[in-house]
């Protein structure tokens, strides 16, 4: 199963976990969003902090998502995006 299909199938679980950890407005970017992921690709998620983040944020969210998906996950907070990569990340980003 492609990673993109897995994200679509687990969308509600992913959004629930994000909210539990104080995150929202979840977008996928990188190879998965472009449709050129490989079996060893990680899942790149762009998020906003929408509530009160947990004390281990975003590490706890990453751990929960990796357990759920069985894939490596990278979480990037939108407001923390470096200007060096901002344009390319936002160009790729698509709503979960």
Task: Label the predicted regions.
Residues 1-27, 33-39, 50-96:
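Catalytic core of pol beta-like nucleotidyltransferases
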